[in-house]
Amino acid sequence: MKKEYAHELFKIAENDWLTAEVLSKNLNIRKETTLFNVEQSVEKSLKAVLCYLQIPIPFTHDIYAIMQKFDENDLPPGGYSLHDLTPFASIRRYEEGKYILTDEEVSQALRAAKLVLDWTRKKLSQ
């Protein structure tokens, strides 16, 4: 992948985060839908950094698998705990009511993703 694509992918990640932020304020939207966009923001941010570093990007939504491509000493904020978002890009999109999410959990996820976005922005400017 071309290094320039990293910036394009990062813009999409930022938009996913903004979408999640807007969705989080609407009580008629499933929290799982909001967290899907949070997960996408994190996933695309990580993939943008890999692209920038010219490391092959795995074709997966599994944040753990994506994180394994990074040096252990250069993980994004949240590290491997970001993997907790992975189910929102897969099975949790197709289930309703098996696990009740709180507003605080959504807020925490948004904050975690924002830290990843900030980390990515710095990485792409180096």
Regions found by a protein language model. Give the residues of each.
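Terminal alpha-helical segments
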Residues: 1-126
